[in-house]
Amino acid sequence: MRMARVQLVIAITGATGTVGKALLSTLIEAGEPVRALVRDPRRLGPYRVRVQLAFSDLGDPHALRHALRGADTVIHLAATIRDQPPRRVEEVNGLGTLRLLRAAERTGVERFVFFSAIGATRFQRTRFFRSKALAEEGVRSSPLRTTIFAPSIVYDRDDPWVTIMRRLALLPVLPISGSGKALYQPIWARDVARCVLASLEGEGDSRYELAGPEVLSYEQMGRLIAAASGRNRPIVHVPLPLVRSGLIWLRRVFGETVFATWEEAELLEIPMLTSRGTADANALGVDPRPMGEVL
């Protein structure tokens, strides 16, 4: 059953990320009024003149309450894989979500849309997945109408990870960290955005696992990106201990501007699969495209 939704403001965190950029474009095209919660509006690019702006920080409850006034829906995309000194992953992903949730409850927001991840549990070995699981538990316990999306790996043609892989393909060989055998069901950011838009017409209190139509390993995704760039390269697997040592050293040298961290590399050893395949996306009227076709 679908219900008509009075058109009020949709507040978005993480609007400058891979999903956020695709979602901004999709919502604007659909004529939805959008408010982006940002620290630096310049990172929105041309979208900054097409949306409302609210300066806020997940560490500031007062600023969050001010930013959410007049909004009926919050879409919470902001998250981090690496520490953001002085804040750690757990504070940004876990406590930050709870602060935003409480602000939404106090300012009259009706619906809270949260992005978790396939495979997020308290018992995962990575801090990112554990923090996402704890945040999801908090969202589930809220009195608001909630919608939870748990996607597999989300990509876009020019997202940071695809860009790094494309640059690595300039080398004579394509380096892949670890075994490269972890499996994913990659889904295009634009398809994810279409799922979110469709879900806004529902009653809420739903959870969707979003996946693309293919099961691909990390190595296979790397090959697809290289091939789409016109560069078919032989694969070289870099042992994880060497990857870890190298990335830790780079972070010490370059600080938080380093292009990748061990936490990010470690995630590419953890499968993100759902037995539901594309069923949840299909239920929202979206037929996800294969990765090779998008690239």
State what each model feature region is.
Residues 90-94, 113, 132:
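Short alpha-helix in the Rossmann-fold core of NAD(P)-dependent oxidoreductases
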Residues 116, 137-160, 167-170:
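Conserved beta-loop-beta element that borders a ligand/cofactor-binding pocket
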